[in-house]
Each structure stands twice: as structure tokens, then as C-alpha cells.
Amino acid sequence: MKSWSSRPVPELPGTGTAPRVHDTSTGQLEPLAARDGRASLYVCGITPYDATHMGHAATYVAFDLLHRLWRDAGWSVDYVQNVTDVDDPLLERADATGVDWRELAESQTELFRTDMSALNVLAPQHYVGATEVVDRIVPAVERLLERGLAYRAPAGTGQGGEPAPAGDVYFDVDAAGALRAEDPDAWVVGSTCRLAGERDRMMPLFADHGGDPDRTGKRDPMDPLLWRAHRAGEPSWDGASLGPGRPGWHIECSVIALDLLPRPFTVQGGGSDLAFPHHDMGAGHAYALSGQPMAEHYVHTAMVGLDGEKMSKSRGNLVLVSTLRAQGMDPAVIRLAILANHYRTDWFWTDELLEQARRRLGTWREAAAKQETAGADAMLEAVRAALGEDLNSPAALIAVDAWAARNLGGAAARGSGASSQDTRLARDTVEALLGVVL
């Protein structure tokens, strides 16, 4: 699957330092280390039926900051993002709108690409649809069956009481967790998000985020689906010994990551709603297949709301990037509105936030339009320091604000040492590290 085009990133003087980020698996700020000068990133992509809402945009802009920081530190970056281009919500939306699910997925994926390019998000090297890797998922599920870490469920009833045919394949979380007796680093359910042993907390999350605890015939209600046997009216693929069907959600990302990234890769990223079960179960699948942890660190972005409520597809209160762009909004303003909020803090989208970002961008561009400015060296170091400490974008914006104010305050405020080179450095800093073109 094609990705999108990226603007060249300006090179900055000096070298940035390795950032520290909050790791969900430890609950602490952790330094990120390169391996032979390379860092690797997997960010879970969209299910393409309501792209690109502000929650999506906030997540991908946050990990774009990390991508840019790694490059500024002189590291090469291996970046993979998937597209869940077949899944129950997509099929339900296609059925409700009378659009073929493949057409819906492709149109929404193309819209997402356009939005990401407009927001100046650096493209992943690998952009992979789940439907493109079914032929690799099937043997992975077969291996889990052979190792006794998965099982076929008998015919029964599904999550909504609908008939469930024999042949659904589930991951056995208890059998996989037992591997810890041999390896203290082995996965157990909940271990990547500090929920291990807290079943009362995990079960509601499992049910609310794609799980099917009420499916009869499962060994444990929290066992996740690996292969969904074919149902009438649903797309299916040749599953070899599994029979016709389609893959479960978590195994898609596990297989893509194992195929394209080191083991373990540096950062697994996504929204906080993916921490459990999606990222945790995906880590379980990856360990069961490879005998190694999936990722070194798990990093999650907070939720975005509107008018005091969580922004979500189910609530129908989405603010779409494409809608704002169609209304004539500069994508750089949208990006600045996102960056005004720390990636780990829940926040609400408002018209005032957008207006503040519009005014801020205008001020920055006015300063950057001056032939000669001063203070860009200090601004560069302040932006690097702010982003290096858990991607503190609000602090980074304040550093640019200070530079702009100094250079719009007249010669006395600007002081000595003004030059055209300073203006170029300021523009390059804001674009290279914050992704905002002045």
C-alpha cells in the first residue's frame, strides 16, 4: 500500500539528544536508546471509515514529533504504520451506507493520506494494509496452534448472541502466560500496560475495545480472536488449514511488526484506548511467535474531546481535518492547535483553540518574514530541550513565542547580532522539529 509524500526535513546545526518519554509499561519517563544508530517505531493506523478526526491527527502528530527528534539526534528511523482495512466497524459502516467495504476503505485511506501530507506528518517507510498480509498471518496462527498457544472454538453463540460457527481460533492467554515460568521477561496478559493480575479492570476494557468475552466455547473470556471463521455475507480469505475466514485485529499488527522491524523494536505507539487490549494482546502474540518482547517501550497519546465530551465515532461528534481544510483552514494552524496540548493530557477541541493557533502562526510568520532576526540559537536549544523531555510541545511553542516577540519588538528588543542567517535558522528549527512551515 502506498504511503504519502513528505517534505524534506531541514538539517539543523549540532545534534539533538535522545528524548525521554513516558512508558505505559513502567509508568515512568524512560530514555530511548538507538541500536547501532537506528530507532524503530510502529504506530497503529486507522480503521478507515471516519478519517481523519482530531483524535487521529493528535496521535500521528505526536509520534511525528518523536520521529523528528530521532532524526535530529542523528538516528536512522524505521517507521511502520498499518491500516486495519478489514474489521467489523468498517464492514458495519459499509453495510449501513450501501458502499462496498473495499471502496470505503480505499477512499478513507486516501483521505487520510491527504490529511497527513497536509499536516506535514512524515510518512512511514512501510504503510501496510491488513488485507495485504493475510498470507503471512495464516501461518503465524497455524504455528500458535501447533505450539498449544491457540485453539479452535466449537460452534456456539457470539458476543451479540448471533450463531458462531466452529473454527474460530483464539489465543490462549493462560497458556501463553505460563511461558513466564521459563523466562521472567515473557509476556503475561496486562504486562505491557501495568494491568497484570487486575482482571476486574481488564475485562471491561476487553469487552469495550473489540473483545468478545461472551463468545461461548472459549477457555477464558479474555482470550482474543486470531482467526474468524467465515460467516455468510462477510469477506473471507483462504486460511489453509484454518479454513476460510479473516484475521483477528491484534494478530495483524503483530505479524506486520515481526516482519518489518527488529525484535524488539524501540516504540509501540498509539492512542491510550489501544493500550489494552490491542497493544497488550499484540505483544502477547509477538512473544509467543518469536520468544522475544515485541517492543522496548509503549507510548500512548491521550484522548481528544469536543464540548466537554470524548470525541468518538460512536458519539458522532467528530471534528475532521478534511472538513477544516475544506473550510479554508491552513493545516499548519490545525497542527499548532494540536501542539498546544501535551500529548499525554486529555484535552478538548474548541473554536477558541483554533483561533489561538491561527493568531500564533500569524505572529511567527510575521517575525520570520523579517530580513534579519536574533535569538534563533537559543530558541533551537530551548525547543530541543522541551521536546526531549517527554515531547513537551506546549513548552516548545512558548520558546518560539519568545523568539517571535523579541523580533517583533523593534531594534531595542531584538538587540545586537541580528542576521538573515538567524531568520533561516529559526524557520528551519520550527519546521524540522515542530513540523510547522513558516
Swiss-Prot record:
Cofactor: Zn(2+)
Domain of life: Bacteria
Record-listed Zn(2+) binding positions: 44, 253, 278
GO CC field: cytosol
EC number(s) recorded for this UniProt protein: 6.3.1.13
Record: residues binding L-cysteinyl-5'-AMP: 44-47, 59, 82-84, 249, 271-273, 304
Annotated segments matching region Disordered: 1-27
Keywords recorded for this protein, A-Z: ATP-binding, Ligase, Metal-binding, Nucleotide-binding, Zinc
Chain positions of motif 'HIGH' region: 46-56
Annotated GO biological process: cysteinyl-tRNA aminoacylation; mycothiol biosynthetic process
Cofactor note: Binds 1 zinc ion per subunit.
Matching Pfam families: tRNA-synt_1e (PF01406)
Cited NCBIfam families: mycothiol_MshC (TIGR03447)
Summary of subunit composition and partner proteins: Monomer.
Role this protein plays: Catalyzes the ATP-dependent condensation of GlcN-Ins and L-cysteine to form L-Cys-GlcN-Ins.
Family that this chain belongs to: Belongs to the class-I aminoacyl-tRNA synthetase family. MshC subfamily.
Protein name: L-cysteine:1D-myo-inositol 2-amino-2-deoxy-alpha-D-glucopyranoside ligase
Organism: Kocuria rhizophila (strain ATCC 9341 / DSM 348 / NBRC 103217 / DC2201)
The organism's taxonomic lineage, starting at the top: Bacteria, Bacillati, Actinomycetota, Actinomycetes, Micrococcales
Gene behind the chain: mshC
